[in-house]
Curated annotation (Swiss-Prot):
Residues modified to 4-hydroxyproline: P2
Sites bearing D-4-hydroxyvaline, chain numbering: V6
The keyword Cytoplasm appears for this protein: no
UniProt keyword terms in alphabetical order: D-amino acid, Hydroxylation, Neurotoxin, Secreted, Toxin
Organism: Conus mus
UniProt keyword Secreted present: yes
Gene Ontology molecular functions: toxin activity
Protein name as catalogued: Conophan mus-V
One of the record's GO cellular component terms: extracellular region
Main location group: secreted
């Protein structure tokens, strides 16, 4: 996953 993606 890209480092700038945020996951809940």
């Amino acid at each position: 996953s890209p480092a700038n993606s945020v996951w809940s």
